[in-house]
């Protein structure tokens, strides 16, 4: 298992639409494990494969306080959504930036687990928001796409500056 590099905006690879996983096998399970390692190392609560330059429909999530409730979503499909909510969202691909994003309050999804077994899940609260956020990544959408062009540009400039400062500090 290893920590993968997380892509940051404005990297256009974040806009690539992910392909369905054809077969859940040892390679896919290794990707899932690496994604969890990466998500935990980056202190995130969710990660889509697109964010680590793997363009397959794979999501890992853990919104628990103890970081011990792993959720794997392979080829997730949104079946139902209802209500309205939203929070100030952040994203590992848009470091240190947050913005309010409107979301459905409840979702029902179908997906495959780490072993390739199909399941359905009804979620609300932070889990529902996280599922929607990560599913957006699979179609090349970022939370900043919900913002005005001016706010989106301001965030992009801040992230680019932050990345330049980190690169300079690294030598």
UniProtKB/Swiss-Prot annotation:
It comes from the Bacteria. Its cofactor is Fe(2+). Its EC number is 3.5.1.88. Binds 1 Fe(2+) ion. InterPro entries: Peptide_deformylase, Peptide_deformylase_sf. Fe cation binds at residues 91, 133, 137. It holds the Pfam family Pep_deformylase. It is an enzyme of class 3 (hydrolase). The active site is at 134. One of its GO terms (biological process) is co-translational protein modification. SUPFAM superfamilies: Peptide deformylase (SSF56420). Removes the formyl group from the N-terminal Met of newly synthesized proteins. Requires at least a dipeptide for an efficient rate of reaction. N-terminal L-methionine is a prerequisite for activity but the enzyme has broad specificity at other positions. Belongs to the polypeptide deformylase family. This is Peptide deformylase. It comes from Cronobacter sakazakii (strain ATCC BAA-894). The lineage of its organism: Bacteria, Pseudomonadati, Pseudomonadota, Gammaproteobacteria, Enterobacterales.
